[in-house]
């Protein structure tokens, strides 16, 4: 594998692009440690070491860091990691890792979201927002039905009346 270019992103962070259209980020010290240079050769062994020791580890830590701040859906977290320019394989491994420890669980995310917004948002609005976050429609409907069975169905017309009364009180 040949290194086509090494582009500085910040003072210490560089994007390494290979002839196989593979791009990944490394810090200045890592470039020096592995003696990577533009138009230089990147052996499969060195790339595997970089992948295992740096890229996968960094992707896992980033995923866990993001999840400590707030819950993400699988699609949101994957998009966020890809935006960080981790390789697709590193993102997949990181996603599998956080999923294996149940740090990432779309079913739980949907249940918490529906519980939090039930009574304030319509079913359709919640479904739309969850679909936009990458949740499959079937999962949303299944969780809505389960929530209705647990807590009793919320009548949307009563909710609209309550909101109208609140609006009139503020006028």
Briefly describe each language-model feature range.
Residues 171:
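Calmodulin-binding IQ motif helices
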């Amino acid at each position: 594998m040949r290194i086509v270019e090494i582009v500085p992103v910040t003072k210490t962070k560089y994007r390494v692009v290979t002839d196989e259209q593979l791009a990944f980020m490394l810090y200045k010290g890592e470039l020096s440690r592995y003696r990577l240079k533009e138009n230089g050769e990147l052996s499969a062994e060195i790339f595997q070491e970089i992948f295992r020791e740096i890229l996968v580890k960094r992707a896992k830590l980033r995923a866990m860091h993001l999840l400590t701040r707030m819950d993400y859906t699988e699609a949101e977290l994957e998009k966020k990691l890809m935006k960080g320019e981790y390789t697709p394989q590193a993102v997949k491994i990181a996603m599998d890792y956080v999923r294996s420890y149940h740090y990432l669980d779309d079913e739980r995310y949907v249940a918490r979201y529906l519980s939090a917004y039930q009574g304030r948002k319509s079913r359709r609005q919640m479904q739309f927002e969850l679909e936009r976050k990458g949740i499959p429609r079937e999962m949303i409907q299944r969780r809505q039905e389960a929530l209705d069975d647990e807590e009793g169905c919320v009548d949307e017309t009563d909710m609209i009346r309550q909101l109208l009364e609140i609006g009139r009180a503020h006028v």
